[in-house]
Amino acid sequence: EGVERGAQWQHLRQLPGQAELPAEALDGQFLRLHLPGGALRWERHTEFTRYTLFQPLPDDRGLGTSDPPLMDALIVGRDWVRAIPGQVLVAIELVMLHADIASDDWLVPARQWFGGRPVAVSRMGRDGHSAVMTDFLLADDGFERILVVAPPGTTETRAGRISQRLLEMETYRLMALLGLPAAKALLPEVAQAERQLSALTARFEAREASDQTLLDELVLLAAGLERATAEYAFRFDATRAYDALMQQRLAELREHYLHGQQTLGEFLQ
């Protein structure tokens, strides 16, 4: 929140081979940097900046392991990630592993990868081209984990499309939740307005005051409530927009139910 591009530019220049990165590189809304062993994408949005790091997963962190550590394998280093300017709103580790998903044999090692915790599971695509699993929880490193399991022949294009939609879906879900504190802050004022309205109605029915007096009090009550809601109008509008985007990304993934498993869509509802 309120992070200047200059601070982001200086931080990006600390990456390997990026010391000469020109400030003008951040004039647009999108930047992709090629790094030793991977790449980083920088995106500027209306309310947030997204950093997406692409890199191979070490061989010893795949299916068959339990709660494998991931931060220590980052090609940019955990200190660089933790020093990204601004407040962290969303932190996700998305891992794509290859396995045969024609049967459900992959489910047991995939659950083990999450340490046996309860997870949501869905098949994706009309033809069930991949499967996704997540527990929607923050791991010890402060990141939420999403596991995608896809056949070995999955193309880079399809892998990228699946990953992007999942990351956007969860990002928009968490951004939509920014409206929750505003709703909680407004709740006492709404409750007070309801009590005042109830009292006004009772006075009107009992003819305890003139119609004009009651009308003036009603107008004053309405004005106060309108001021309170106007203060949070942007946040609530943004919440509705983010929720619509989240639902759109989920629909684009065309998830399918696995017998006996809670789907991502069911959890999100």
Residue ranges and their predicted role:
Residues 34-39, 128-135, 239, 261:
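Short small/polar-residue motifs
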